[in-house]
Amino acid sequence: MLDIFRGLKSLVKISHVNTDSPVFRLHYSITVIILMSFSLIVTTRQYVGNPIDCVHTKDIPADVLNTYCWIHSTFALKSLFLKEVGKDVPYPGVGNSAEATAADKKIYKYYQWVCFCLFFQAILFYTPRWLWKSWEGGKIHALMMDLDIGICSEIEKKQKKKLLLDYLWDNLRYHNWWAYRYYVCEFLSLCNVIGQMFLMNRFFDGEFMTFGLDVITHMEADQEDRMDPMIYIFPRMTKCTFYKYGVSGEVERHDAICILPLNVVNEKIYIFLWFWFIILTILTTLTIFYRIIIIFSPRMRVYLLRLRFRLVRRDAIEIIVRRSKMGDWFLLYRLGENLDSIIFRDVMQDLANRLHNNQHHRVPGMKGEIQDA
């Protein structure tokens, strides 16, 4: 079991080359590890232990009844969830169902699919990362040329800096499409986490979207007057109806009480995922707004470069941003996070000097204004 968990580290191994943002990494690293771990836990509990244990008379073999109720779902009665336990009902939602209507029955058929659903969710969270990794194509790593460690001879260092500078000079204003692909991947991450909230809401018959809020409300209110949302969605005890032929050839109905110990685990998993997905949604939404500001505000690009790379002179940053486009800014920002700070400062200064002394890359615009993307 521990070996399996250790194997997850290689699945979402984070490269020493930084090509994305911390929020983006939360989606494909932390979240994937969480979902895969939960899937393994549920799978282990489901196939190693007893995920369901139904109680009935000896007329029906226990393994037959357990298998039937596991496959064909169980149910509880909505009208009995607010009844007093120990007096009116043995457990919330469990009672006499002989005259219960179909509308009063709360059917539970999700539990055998939880481990597969969690695994599928993990794949969806990793998909934007896989897409960006394919589109990025190792560009940052190739341009670094081991200049991130800064330990090489001065001659070799000058040669590599000149190669990097020549690339930036020859390809200036040609990186917009490359940057927009990354922004698309961040937007896909936002769509994914929101879509998964709706997916789980459908998975739990419309009960998941407000699950976390309902739990908080229940904890703050008088619990005798409110239905526990965790017990309602993840009951520990339910009912199952089994039909078989009697000795006379007539169909006999048998009601069984089923214990679902796996729901103790499922309850904790999904209350955590609800809050985690809300946090991811908020952070990713803020990131998208941040990207929009960067696209339309060159002055913000200048400010961010100055804030992040303080060794680079302000006039050099302003010249580069004025003569380049948004995609170039994105590439330089990514390079700055990976290169040795002194080397990055030198490259930026050399690029600014070359732009200042040569009008070949001048972008038409209003005099005195920083050129828009």
Curated annotation (Swiss-Prot):
Q: Name one GO molecular function term.
A: photoreceptor activity
**A Pfam family name for this chain?**
Innexin
Keyword Cell membrane listed? The answer is yes
Q: List the stretches on the Cytoplasmic face of the membrane.
A: 1-21, 128-176, 290-373
Which ranges does the record list as Extracellular topological domains? 43-106, 200-268
**What is the membrane topology listed in the Swiss-Prot or TrEMBL record?**
Multi-pass membrane protein
Gene Ontology process terms (BP): gap junction assembly; monoatomic ion transmembrane transport; response to light stimulus
What are the UniProt keywords, alphabetically?
Cell junction, Cell membrane, Gap junction, Ion channel, Ion transport, Membrane, Transmembrane, Transmembrane helix, Transport
Primary localization:
membrane
The name on file for this protein is: Innexin shaking-B
What's a single GO CC term here?
gap junction
Q: Does the keyword Transmembrane apply?
A: yes
What domain of life does the native source organism fall in?
A: Eukaryota
Question: Where are the membrane-spanning stretches?
Answer: 22-42, 107-127, 177-199, 269-289
Supply the InterPro entries for this chain: Innexin
Role of this protein: Structural component of the gap junctions at electrical synapses in distal and mid-depth levels in the lamina.
